[in-house]
């Protein structure tokens, strides 16, 4: 990796790209798309076409005559011939000339000549001979006549550190198939292999190309000729195996029709256990007895209408309710001439209200029945946990198991009392019988970790026993031979540290979203049944039995120690050891679960340990891990570092690369343990989804599991199509008091129970989502009861440990609020924006609209969200407004820029002036820096970027942290334009820094993190809250500055946890900058009260927008109330 590099080096990428003004990623309303950016067809080949002069391998291809049909070599040749042009420009010209080498060369030659002429005659009139030739496509920067993107580095003295661009792809660096010799690991040598028995087993064909029904499977047919008991048993197993299907889009209709009976059966079986309820009586009782707010909510009507309904109580029957007129007297008097129409409407309205109430109650009944069914499965887990000495009962809705293994070593318990308060409540009571205590101790097994011998692996069963086991697949038995018995938990597990938490967001990145591929399979209902039959027999032949010979469930024992497949240097924390045992318990019971440990406690560590444990006990893969883009490479590194014996394959790359990857991974099926991919690909186009769907994964892990907390989202539907025997959701967020989220999590755990109830659930959630009255945040009694029941029932399936419980492993965290003053310029701007807010609120409240059509439209289109955003920007920095560059200046600028070659021919002064009018002072300054020959005199020359109350406070903080304490610091901001300003501030202060935001290439993000760890001379890392606020590990810094806070405090907490997590050795200080007497104080107060968080679902952008709009409305009301009275007093 390199340090600072000159800006003209083509083989160095500036990170992130948005730090260059070529990409406008800001809150400015001006967001033009530069025509220089290649379309999808070129973008998909970008990594192959990109000119890399430092790569000697490319030189060999450019010295020979260009072969026909080789645009890659042609593009490299052009780049070498014209090194004074950027790669982007060469690509754009090559494309605009239809990939014709000769035409592109001629065009670039003319551009070079034009640039030379302009350089020597920069003061000449643009109308002279140096004017570009009249080829409209030749000026991609200005062929619209408007101002395009802001280009170039605005600060030649920038102290930002850049890193060399990655030369290889993620797959090349981490693929086990590509790098088979990179890691060697000694597997257990004491395997007892019976070659004669193995020779009798059928050959397993791995190649999977199309859907073949079980009764048509060629493997199955091959057994018919064998006429052996094993062949017959195998054929029966294939016929009943649901997880072994390989869907093809040509066969989906057939599969859907064949699955219909299974779906119906599942629903019928489930309904049989649900007690019949007289729905009409329940609805009538609700109408007569319910609270007004509940009545309004379930009938999907206004509070006023609900009061009218209540005024006619009691109703003798539902028929009497339908025949009641719910119009008030004023409405009747004002519409006496329309009585007939109103009577019909009234009747229709009564029926509509009744239908809504009926649908809602039916939905809540469905929820209640599902909760009851889930409870029975929860009891199975609870009963086995009691064998460990754990009592699950209690008010807490989540498990917080800590150090269960230590409960059995009385002499080791004394030192852990402080961190085992929850354990003390969970252990068996003092009145337990001696037999119960013996049973509790009997389920804990350990082994000698100092032994050099590998953990013994189970010997293969004789063919006769294998045949018998397969014949009884529907009721699996434990193989209990004295020589072959394997204690399920007697082997062990462990893993590293580093988790990748919730980020409430999958940031907007370049995760290879190929728009032309966004056509999805219409998979029908078969996926619901295929995916989720968690009680079905596992596809692999090593399935661990859940029933012993005497018909009783075997005890899943608590094991101590780490797996032998983990690196010898790794040791597990006690709570992590407990977490792996809990995962194993749920896995053996074939029930999915949620690991919700607090952010920074090493969920990644526990997952990799669990995979190592599964391989050690011969539970085969492949497994799948779905992660946010920012954490992809970190996951791959963690696998390499902590479990080198596991064979990991990343599924990530461009469109063409992924096509090659699919072929490679299909050809090497069975040669890898885990596939790691991103959410954008797992829920992407049909090819990616189909490939992953047909891998027949054993375990699927969803990192940042909050993305699955909305069962009605498109992403949830796509991800649930990925088949798996066991699903694990990782999240650092606690359960919210939100019924929709709880039911989504339940569907994730036990999806087959939801098939017949899906419509009833959707009716409730859709109704709740569109409620617009003041009671929209109210949970009806039925909903609150369901929430309480659901949270209690889900307790066995959700494990959450908080940092305060494992504080002995983490240094303390200190949070501070640093108040900042508005400077004079900020105060003037802020007061002006306040008046706009007040006027907007007053006019809407009084129903006054301007007579001028333009002003009226402006008022109606404005929203509280936009107005509050303006106040937030004023609290941050005055350069986020156009205050310095007045109309007179931008008129001169729009005229001067026409002398630039990019705008001389097609530039339109009026269009350019209009574009400039929407830009902020900082954006206009960047534009001037970008065109120094014509606009340099308009640049800001007085360090205006240093003039802000927050910048003053930041300077003092940085001096204390960097100069006085010699420590590192992370600075987070929600806005990329603020990060641009911070770049100039830090460069002015001469602090070296790195930057990461949503536009930073995924392939380069880990390089930045590595650079920050390795280079002690780089004290600052600036990050966007959304892109850098989750998943990554930055414990080398122990100071965090939140430059601007989010509406949701969870976002800021995640950002802070980049430093306060497992691996941190110093005390962590988190400082939030808040401008006094500004909107930021109000936001902070709302955040402290955690308002609106229950409805927050970060994956669902619509829900996020609703949250921000709601908070903005509240803030506008607060501002209006605080300022209207003083204003009236003055008058």
UniProtKB/Swiss-Prot annotation:
Keyword DNA repair: yes
Polar residues: compositionally biased ranges: 16-36
Lineage, uppermost ranks: Eukaryota, Fungi, Dikarya, Ascomycota, Saccharomycotina
Region of interest (Disordered), residue spans: 1-70, 114-141, 242-273, 327-350, 400-533
GO biological process, one term: subtelomeric heterochromatin formation
Cell compartment(s), UniProt: Nucleus; Chromosome
Enzyme nomenclature, EC number: 3.6.4.12
Acidic residues: compositionally biased ranges: 250-271, 405-416, 480-533
InterPro entries membership: Helicase_ATP-bd, Helicase_C-like, P-loop_NTPase, SNF2-like_sf, SNF2/RAD54-like_C, SNF2_N
Record's subunit section: Homodimer.
SMART domains referenced in this protein's UniProt entry, alphabetically: DEXDc, HELICc
Species for this entry: Saccharomyces cerevisiae (strain ATCC 204508 / S288c) (Baker's yeast)
Gene name linked to the record: FUN30
Keyword DNA-binding attributed: yes
KO phenotype (gene knockout): Impaired ability to repair double-strand breaks (DSBs).
Region (CUE-like region): 76-111
The name this protein goes by in its record: ATP-dependent helicase FUN30
UniProt keywords, alphabetically: ATP-binding, Chromatin regulator, Chromosome, DNA damage, DNA repair, DNA-binding, Helicase, Hydrolase, Nucleotide-binding, Nucleus, Phosphoprotein
Additional notes on this entry: Present with 6800 molecules/cell in log phase SD medium.
Catalytic activity: ATP + H2O = ADP + phosphate + H(+)
Residue interval(s) of motif DEGH box: 703-706
GO cellular component annotations of the record: chromatin; chromosome, centromeric region; chromosome, telomeric region; mating-type region heterochromatin; mitochondrion; nucleus
Domain of life, source organism: Eukaryota
Location of Phosphoserine modifications: 232, 369, 451
Residue ranges the record marks as coiled coil: none
